[in-house]
Curated annotation (Swiss-Prot):
Principal location: Golgi
Protein's recorded name: Galactose-3-O-sulfotransferase 3
Native source organism of the sequence: Homo sapiens (Human)
Glycosylated residues, chain numbering: 91, 110, 177, 302
Subcellular locations according to the entry: Golgi apparatus, Golgi stack membrane
Cytoplasmic side: 1-19
EC number: 2.8.2.-
Chain positions covered by the region annotation Disordered: 399-431
Ranges in the topological domain labelled Lumenal: 41-431
Amino acid sequence: MPPILQRLQQATKMMSRRKILLLVLGCSTVSLLIHQGAQLSWYPKLFPLSCPPLRNSPPRPKHMTVAFLKTHKTAGTTVQNILFRFAERHNLTVALPHPSCEHQFCYPRNFSAHFVHPATRPPHVLASHLRFDRAELERLMPPSTVYVTILREPAAMFESLFSYYNQYCPAFRRVPNASLEAFLRAPEAYYRAGEHFAMFAHNTLAYDLGGDNERSPRDDAAYLAGLIRQVEEVFSLVMIAEYFDESLVLLRRLLAWDLDDVLYAKLNARAASSRLAAIPAALARAARTWNALDAGLYDHFNATFWRHVARAGRACVEREARELREARQRLLRRCFGDEPLLRPAAQIRTKQLQPWQPSRKVDIMGYDLPGGGAGPATEACLKLAMPEVQYSNYLLRKQKRRGGARARPEPVLDNPPPRPIRVLPRGPQGP
């Protein structure tokens, strides 16, 4: 056979082998996808993320001990719900308040380990409101605990505090016509240090973090610097509410969680009629001036947050955040219909999903399940949108019945929410 024909025959054989190889690979891929499809939970399964780990290290198991300092009006309820659901899926114990504290750890008192219900000790996860006390948390939580918190831009946060706590904070009740502008024009005319719930009217972030909210960085810059150092010594991650999805990407990477573990529904959100569409610049400046300690904390940790993003790779974090948003939309559609809408509490038929309303002047929105139904998917969707008080009560009942033993999940029961009462590790240490 002429050489040219021999080369042609060899080339034909090579092409046939490649086609066979591609066909085998294709069939294997389809088979794998079909197999995975049979195992799909209600959480969307994502292909492995393309972002590299934060450090060149072998894969870590998911970290199971987390303390989240839930600050006020910072999207903390949504983060809490993420942690509650993670704890349930992994059969972890969640620290919950003693009944005398209701659904917060006796806030605004300094946290004490005695505020924790005995049926929820020793805990893996803590995520309810408290005023930070490092020594008491060290007594309660395991040494491997990772500490995280979240901050929000002080002007936007203060507008939310003023609206939400208008009927509870004496300083806010004194303001004619419930006018935020009037309060910020002369806050000293309405504010009285030491009054019950006074911390909601002045430097609330600093107070939640265990600081003295009456200090002013203009008069004592060293105090702000010292408070920042204390926060940095304890918290491995300070999330930023304005960059919520990016914060969750950093959180899941810190804890070696999957992106599925941080999917969420936005909780405890006010109706548009209950909030300012936009805070005027002059009002924002006045709010930051009055809450100068909070402004200093936020500005510092906002800058720190973006340094974390840069170390992780900004393009990588943005890509993961986009994947998170897409997966979240799929999840919400699956649970609440093609157009999931936040609804007023009066329009929510499912009692377990009716959010508590702080006053007649504020509408807190929630979700509802489309029609009846039962089974794991409905139960999971219910937990995704369950308000804080109902979920806390449910977990407490479950953990009390468990009595330390690992029991099967129980169904969620109706439980109308009550009115509210008035050196740690820098990162994960093993599994």
